[in-house]
Amino acid sequence: MLAKRIIPCLDVTNGRVVKGVNFVELRDAGDPVEIARRYDEQGADEITFLDITATSDGRDLMLHIIEDVASQVFIPLTVGGGVRTVEDVRRLLNAGADKISVNSSAIANPQLVSDATARYGSQCIVVAIDAKRSSAPGEAPRWEVFTHGGRKATGLDAVQWAREMATRGAGEILLTSMDRDGTKSGFDLELTRAVSDAVPVPVIASGGVGGLQDLADGITRGRADAVLAASIFHYGQHTVGEAKAFMAREGIPVRI
């Protein structure tokens, strides 16, 4: 079995790392370069860096911050937010990103995923899906895809959308439960399982980590290939090393 990855996530706006609850109520968590360096030293497998207001604000890419982070970090760096064209993908890769995450732009133009993977390879294109439960209690579970930092409903079914993106060449799915984001109540394991079982590519579980057991559950019960977390690492509740040691004790293969 391949080693499972632990990925700290840096949500960035106006050049600062922030953390919110259910995609709002953002509070400052520090300088992205400093935080990324700390996670690299702690043994993170990768870092995900999302400019969470670039799309909704219509802003350009934060290339200078990406260059600064990439110069300090020696593990794979995934960058997303405001990526609209294949040219944007090229600029971010040139700035030092290893993988590019697309979200709202993939829905506006699904061909972007096909074109970007054709040019740069599936291994560096991640499709981020922000999903919110849309089924009523007692109904078969359904989740709707949202865009623009969770502000815009699309009417798309999250599991079907993940399938389409994998068919178009996405190398990974970064799956965030909007219902769980920032709540520290654990991943939406039903959502994570539904998408993991539906696609042939790795799924990164995101949204809701409150403790180390939640990370392990994302792998063992959610069937994710990687787990992403922010606040438990940003505010010093746990280090990446502690998370890996816990997962190893749970019998999950990790790189120590």
Curated annotation (Swiss-Prot):
Heterodimer of HisH and HisF. It comes from the Bacteria. IGPS catalyzes the conversion of PRFAR and glutamine to IGP, AICAR and glutamate. The HisF subunit catalyzes the cyclization activity that produces IGP and AICAR from PRFAR using the ammonia provided by the HisH subunit. HAMAP family: HisF. GO terms for biological process: L-histidine biosynthetic process. It is found in: Cytoplasm. The active site is at 11, 130. It is an enzyme of class 4 (lyase). It comes from Cupriavidus taiwanensis (strain DSM 17343 / BCRC 17206 / CCUG 44338 / CIP 107171 / LMG 19424 / R1). It catalyses: 5-[(5-phospho-1-deoxy-D-ribulos-1-ylimino)methylamino]-1-(5-phospho-beta-D-ribosyl)imidazole-4-carboxamide + L-glutamine = D-erythro-1-(imidazol-4-yl)glycerol 3-phosphate + 5-amino-1-(5-phospho-beta-D-ribosyl)imidazole-4-carboxamide + L-glutamate + H(+). This is Imidazole glycerol phosphate synthase subunit HisF. Gene3D superfamilies: Aldolase class I. One of its GO terms (cellular component) is cytoplasm. Its EC number is 4.3.2.10. Disulfide bonds: none annotated. Pathway: Amino-acid biosynthesis; L-histidine biosynthesis; L-histidine from 5-phospho-alpha-D-ribose 1-diphosphate: step 5/9. Keywords: Amino-acid biosynthesis, Cytoplasm, Histidine biosynthesis, Lyase. Belongs to the HisA/HisF family. Its main location: cytoplasm. GO terms for molecular function: imidazoleglycerol-phosphate synthase activity; lyase activity.
